[in-house]
């Protein structure tokens, strides 16, 4: 038992040596470089305004344009969309429906087709104008 109850040895305190001085001076931290690339939801608008240089997709100010609603969109995509709208007959159909609404004297909302009698008449009239 005497062996187990040995008193803990007291550590001799080492002589304190003179503290070494740390690095003197050093380099000044550089400010972070401001990004020229616009990211996120308002990326195109910030490039269009001129606050950023380009979008993450690579669009620059000269490749952006405002659409009818005032949104900043890609010039190339906008032109392509307009071309497809005319090419695939959607423009022709919209013109036909507009003409039919005018001929039938329909104002306000009216579903083309559907279950109502007015809607069915409008659809038939629209189709007749579309085929011409």
UniProtKB/Swiss-Prot annotation:
Here the segments flagged for biased composition (Basic residues) are 1-44
Bias class Polar residues marks the residues at: 57-66
- Biological process, per Gene Ontology: chromosome condensation
Annotated region Disordered: the residues are: 1-84
Any one of the GO CC terms = nucleus
| InterPro entries in alphabetical order | DNVP
Phosphoprotein as UniProt keyword? yes
Coiled-coil regions listed in the entry: none
> Domain of life of the organism in this record?
Eukaryota
Q: Which UniProt keywords apply?
A: Chromosome, DNA condensation, DNA-binding, Nucleus, Phosphoprotein
Q: What does this protein do?
A: DNA-binding protein, which similarly to histones, may compact DNA into chromatin.
Q: What is this protein called?
A: Dinoflagellate viral nucleoprotein 5
Q: Which organism is it from?
A: Hematodinium sp
Its lineage opens with: Eukaryota, Sar, Alveolata, Dinophyceae, Syndiniales
